Amino acid sequence: MVDDYDRAIKYYTEKLGFTLVEDIPQLGKRWVVVTPNPGSDCNLLLARASNERQEGFIGNQCGGRVFLFLQTDNFWRDYNAMRSNGVEFSQEPREEEYGTVVVFEDLYGNRWDLYQNKQS
C-alpha cells in the first residue's frame, strides 16, 4: 500500500528503475501498475490506502521482515544503479549459499531483498 500514487510512481520509476505499465483513473482511485522488467509477468500494483486502518500498515505490511524479493541477473549493476539513485540499503551486500543479496528499504520503510542466484 502507498499513501500517494504520484509519489510512489516517482520512487519506483526513478529510484528503482521500474517502468510504469498502467495508470488508469477510476472512481476516487487509480489502477497503477509498475514492473521491474518490461515484458515480464512480474508486476507490482500500487494500491493507495483508503482508510485509517490501511494507512497504519503502510511501511509495515510484513511486520518488519523482508516483504518483497527482487531477483536480478546482474547484482552489481543493479545495486550500483540503485545506490546512485539514492536507494537506502540497511546493510552491505553479502554472499550467501544461494547467491549475492542486500536488503534495502523503499520510501515507506518496507524491506526488500535485491538478490542474484549463484546460477545466474
Kindly label every feature range from the protein language model.
Residues 4-5, 73-76:
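Helix N-cap motif at beta-to-alpha junctions
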Residues 19-71, 79-107, 115-120:
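Vicinal oxygen chelate
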Residues 4, 106-109:
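Conserved phosphate-binding and hydrolysis motifs of nucleotide-dependent enzymes
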